[in-house]
Amino acid sequence: MKIKEAEFVISAVKGEQYPEDNLPEVALVGRSNVGKSSLINKLCNRRHLARTSSTPGKTQTLNFYRINQAAYIVDLPGYGYASVSKTQRASWGPMMEHYLKKRLQLRGVIQLVDIRHPPTKDDIAMREWLNHFKIGAAVIATKADKINRGRYAKHVKQIRQDLAIPKEIPIIVFSAETGHGKEDVLDLLDYFWNGIQPEEEREIL
């Protein structure tokens, strides 16, 4: 799949603000500063489509990006950053839960984790929450350019073990800097949105 057109549509905090064009959606979840915005920008070949920030917890809304006029990527607020106020965190929880449990257009969830480190308690809690509500979620291990390629398999094994991810669920190694794993992620989105399997086997650990 190729992304030929991408546009930011809306930042939403409640269901009435969500797009009403009934297009399929894939949600991105992950710890603050794990690289969700950088992932979106790399996939869309746009530097500033999704705003990146050096300040964790900057994303406080559900941000909808329309892709090829046919589907959405939805960037959810990052979790697990202590400096964000308790009031803000308390408001994010119900907002994210309502979207993930109730949104009929949601076709899949992608959880992003930092490949450099073992999953955090927040990563594990999110995974357990998704499993509890039977929400299928793939995993992308970000910031792959920060470690030696020879260490990918070891780090992915740790992620799979800590998050209790079955072998049939892919973990894609990705770098927004080099583009490593980009085609794998595009294939995954195509599968979630359209049910289309990749034409060729790719490096998914």
Swiss-Prot record:
Necessary for normal cell division and for the maintenance of normal septation. Mg(2+) binds at S37, T59. Belongs to the TRAFAC class TrmE-Era-EngA-EngB-Septin-like GTPase superfamily. EngB GTPase family. HAMAP family: GTPase_EngB. Its cofactor is Mg(2+). InterPro entries: G_ENGB_dom, GTP-bd, GTP-bd_ribosome_bio_YsxC, P-loop_NTPase. GO terms for molecular function: GTP binding; metal ion binding. Pfam families: MMR_HSR1 (PF01926). Residues 22-195 form the EngB-type G domain. This is Probable GTP-binding protein EngB. It comes from Heliobacterium modesticaldum (strain ATCC 51547 / Ice1). GTP binds at residues 30-37, 57-61, 75-78, 142-145, 174-176. CDD domains: YihA_EngB. One of its GO terms (cellular component) is cytosol. Keywords: Cell cycle, Cell division, GTP-binding, Magnesium, Metal-binding, Nucleotide-binding, Septation. One of its GO terms (biological process) is division septum assembly.
